[in-house]
Amino acid sequence: MSLKFDSQHTALIVIDPQNWTLGMPLAPWPAQDVATNVALLAGAIRPAGCVILTRAAFSAGYVDALKTPVDLSLTLPEGGIPDAALAFNPVVVAAGYDLIITKRQWSAFYGTELDLQLRRRGITTIVLAGVMSNFGVESTARDAWQHNYAVVVAEDACSSLGSDMHEFSMKRIMPRIARVRATAEIVAALQ
């Protein structure tokens, strides 16, 4: 299915393009490739649409972090995440953005004003990019689909902690709730 966009009603949502997340060992795409592809997408979408960056952040002592019992919990650094680690990747920031959404869980929709901001801007289609493919990106894609947005995932502008995690999400989950495409195809459809 070929892509067609109404660029005035399209937003790029970049999940957690922060130094600490992009500093992790990512696969299948290294952080520099993810950041470069995000910048290409932002350059194509921003002239008529909207670019939104999300950031994961927590209050002192992680009082607002989830603490439910699980078998494999996310380990957060004792004493908090340093400010430099929370900062956005400079390649992504240089591409420009319109809004920042702070989130405290995987999905950019849950507990944030993302849906409100998208609807007030007349957004009907979202393009997703960022890290981690099978956590923040997938959770946001699921919620976007449930909120009746058309979802496009830029596969090569996403990555995860392992190729197997990324590929399962992109090949098994995302096609049921989104269109999964390469950055170049999305950029071409926006021109």
Say what each PLM segment does:
Residues M1-L99, A189-Q191:
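Active-site acidic carboxylates
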Residues P47-G49, G122, N148:
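Glycine-centered short loops/turns at secondary-structure junctions
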Residues P82-V131:
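Internal catalytic-core helix/loop-beta-alpha segment
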Residues V127-G130, N148-S163:
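A short glycine-rich beta-strand->turn/loop micro-motif centered on a GG-aromatic cluster
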Residues G162-P175:
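Active-site-proximal loop->helix
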Residues I177-Q191:
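A charged, well-structured terminal subsegment
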